[in-house]
Structures are given as C-alpha cells and as structure tokens.
Amino acid sequence: MDAQSSAKVNSRKRRKEVPGPNGATEEDGIPSKVQRCAVGLRQPAPFSDEIEVDFSKPYVRVTMEEACRGTPCERPVRVYADGIFDLFHSGHARALMQAKNLFPNTYLIVGVCSDELTHNFKGFTVMNENERYDAVQHCRYVDEVVRNAPWTLTPEFLAEHRIDFVAHDDIPYSSAGSDDVYKHIKEAGMFAPTQRTEGISTSDIITRIVRDYDVYARRNLQRGYTAKELNVSFINEKKYHLQERVDKVKKKVKDVEEKSKEFVQKVEEKSIDLIQKWEEKSREFIGSFLEMFGPEGALKHMLKEGKGRMLQAISPKQSPSSSPTHERSPSPSFRWPFSGKTSPSSSPASLSRCKAVTCDISEDEED
C-alpha cells in the first residue's frame, strides 16, 4: 500500500505555487481555500502616545535568528514600517501585511509622516495628515500608529519605541539629501525587506485622475458639485454640460442602432424560416401534383379503369359455353324447312351428303 501511494504521489502533475491575492499560495491559478473566521478587530489600532509603556524593563533588541525562531517567548518582535500612505490603497495594505508576517510573533508599528514633513520633502498630498492617520488605523494588520513620524529614523526614536526591525522595500529611497534614508538601518542589521506591489501606487492613481480630468469633472458636475467647488471656469462648465448632452444623444443613437440591428436580424431570421417553410410546402405540393397528374399518376389509372369499364359495358365478351348461337346449332337430324315429309330410310350416300351440309352450316353460323 505504501509503495502504491508513493507511486501515485510521484505520478501526479506537479502544481505551480503562486502567491494569491490574500497572501496564500494558489495551485494552478485556483485560490487556496481558507477556513471561514468570524473573529475580527472591532477597534482601530491605537496611537503610540495613547499607550502606556513600561520603561522599567531594559530594551534588548532581538536578533534576526531569534526572531525567525519565534523567540523570545515573553514578548513579540516589534517591527516598524513608515510611509506617507496618501490615498491608502491595496499596495499599502500588502506592504503592511508582509511586515506583519515577517516573523511568527510580530507586533507591527506604523509611522505616518505629517503634512509639514511630506510637503517639504516629497510634495503635496491629496489627503491631510488626520485622514491618513485614520486610514492606517483601520488597516487590519496594524497594531500601533505613530503620528508625526520622523523622515529619517534616529537611534533615539528606535529606542523610544523599542523597535527591533524596520520593514520597507529594498529599493534605495533617496530623499533629504541622502541616497538612501535606510542606509544606516541596513548597516545595523535591522532592515527587513518587503516586496513592492507593481501596478499600483498613489502616483499612478493621481495620474489616472489627471489623464481623465474632463471625465471626472463632468461626473462631479452631474452629481451636484458646483463649478466653484471643482475650480472650473464658466466656459468649461458650459462646455462640460454641452458634452454631457452630446454624449446622451450619442447614447440614444447608439441604442437605436443596436435595436434596429436586432430588429433587422430578427426579420432576417424570420424570412429565412419562411423561405425554408415555403420550399418545404412547394416540394410537398409538387410531389402531390405529380402523384395525381404525372405520367404514372392516379388520374391516368382512373381514366384507364373507366375506359375499360365503358368498353366492357358497350361490348361485353361472350363465353363459348354460354353462346346462344351454339345452342341453336342444328343437330345431325336437322330438317330442311322445305321438306314436307320425312323421307323414308335414306341411303347411305344421301346421309353422308346431309352431314356435310350440316357441318358447313354450323361453321358459317359460328363465323
């Protein structure tokens, strides 16, 4: 049994494991099943300045080997991840998920930079700092949020928050006059790399909005926003309204075209059905006509039968046995009407002559 089972396992097709959207592996593109769990976080992650910290215990950083083994058991590994988190999207959530799952027992601290630092070093944001704090607070992987996080991490900040490792993608982040703001963290052995999610970023989202600015401006005008709120001039407002009407007319024309195409298609289908039915009926009619009036049709047989009956009625055939002529044929003792008396016993010569004459008369009557 063991040999058979091992042979079956070896003969199976090797399935490719691909990371799924939920971080689990997928087999041949099919998401792996997970057990349904109704337990979830009911409160947002607290801010760091709202948590009481026991500074009486000394801060001893955990090494990478100990963190991977899940030790020490008395406390989790404290991992720090920072960012701007403007227009919080799935790329941010995936990065925080990776940071949370770096070690078996992880406590994730997320630092969010303020508007002042962000505007000075990176540029203007769509969301203000309070909105960005709130967005990160409600991410399920976050255990603690640090407001007004520093742009460059200092030893004092790391010691204050008792940070063991810093999680970020390993692409050099040049800013604030430095080629890589995480260079000293990497040199200290505290850097834990994560993978960036391709195809999604705050800059990409803003690019989409700017690229289709007219579409979104018309959309918001249609939903009740004023031109002043959208910072749209009077001329552009009228232009957008006109474009909206033109689009409605185009949509109606397109609907009419589609309906007309459907109608024409239905008519064509009906006409094809009618033609097929007409062909079938015409074949049946021609077949029945030929059966009745063709060379070997029923009508010809009827005429032949009628003609035969008429001829039989006009001149019926007489059978030789029932012919009246045969019944009236004279016997050998035929008497001539002009002979008055019966002659006495005739001679043999006269009798033979009478027989010959009688036979000739009988043959003439039959003819």
Curated annotation (Swiss-Prot):
Catalytic activity of the protein: phosphocholine + CTP + H(+) = CDP-choline + diphosphate
Region annotation Autoinhibitory (AI): where it falls in the sequence: 272-293
Modification type N6-acetyllysine: residues: 8
Chain positions found as Phosphothreonine: 325, 342, 358
Modified residues (N-acetylmethionine): 1
Enzyme Commission no: 2.7.7.15
Repeat region (Sequence), residues: 319-324, 329-333, 343-348
GO cellular component: cytosol; endoplasmic reticulum; endoplasmic reticulum membrane; extrinsic component of membrane; glycogen granule; nuclear envelope; nucleus
Span list, region Disordered: 1-31, 313-367
Skewed-composition ranges (Polar residues): 315-324
Post-translational modification note: The serine residues of the C-terminus are phosphorylated. The inactive soluble form is stabilized by phosphorylation, the active membrane bound form is promoted by anionic lipids or diacylglycerol, and is stabilized by dephosphorylation. The N-terminus is blocked.
Keyword Membrane: yes
Activity control summary: Interconverts between an inactive cytosolic form and an active membrane-bound form. Activation involves disruption of an inhibitory interaction between helices at the base of the active site and the autoinhibitory (AI) region. Activated by N-methylethanolamine. Activated by oleic acid-containing phosphatidylcholine vesicles.
Keywords: Acetylation, Cytoplasm, Endoplasmic reticulum, Lipid biosynthesis, Lipid metabolism, Membrane, Nucleotidyltransferase, Nucleus, Phospholipid biosynthesis, Phospholipid metabolism, Phosphoprotein, Repeat, Transferase, Ubl conjugation
Annotated positions of the Phosphoserine modification: 233, 315, 319, 321-323, 329, 331, 333, 343, 345-347, 350, 352, 362
Top EC class, one word: transferase
Keyword match GTP-binding: no
Domain of life: Eukaryota
Assembly notes: Homodimer.
General remark: The cytidylyltransferase may interact with membranes through its amphipathic helix.
Protein name from the UniProt record: Choline-phosphate cytidylyltransferase A
Organism: Rattus norvegicus
Gene it is expressed from: Pcyt1a
